[in-house]
Amino acid sequence: MAADIRIARKNAGKVGLPEINLGVLAGTGGTARLTRLSGKAMALEMMVTGELMSFEDAHGCNLINHIWEGSAEDFRRDILDWCSQFTLPNKAVKAVGNIKRSCQTGPEIPFEYHLALERELQASLFNSTDAKEGIAAYVEKRVANFTGQ
């Protein structure tokens, strides 16, 4: 649940927090993350019953973004291919990092502070080489080639 984007391989497992069956709670962030991802009622039900759910059910509870079919080897290859869209030279990694920071920090602070954080993060990107490349590529109707600068 701590992953930014969660992708499962069809029929390769189940999702849940069964720690209650050991007489403990889902520590190390389990209760906090699950509550934020799926809402209080669903999180409570999952944690107090300790039941595991299919990836399809987990997808319906916003715990999994995508479910892909294929062998373990194909899945690994497909994941790496899919993730390449978020890395150099396809995306500006500083912008990706700032998006992650805003999305992770923002919900924990008042809305007006989240907007201020977003403005600060955006301002930090405008003078970057990658922002200049992205804007130039847009104007010139070509694909940007980001460098991480």
Role assignments for model-derived ranges:
Residues 1-47, 78-82:
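CoA-thioester-processing core
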Residues 124-125:
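C-terminal and late-domain segments of enzyme folds
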Residues 34, 58, 99, 138:
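Terminal peptide-recognition signature
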Residues 30-33, 42, 95-98, 118-121, ...:
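Hydrophobic alpha-helical segments typical of transmembrane helices
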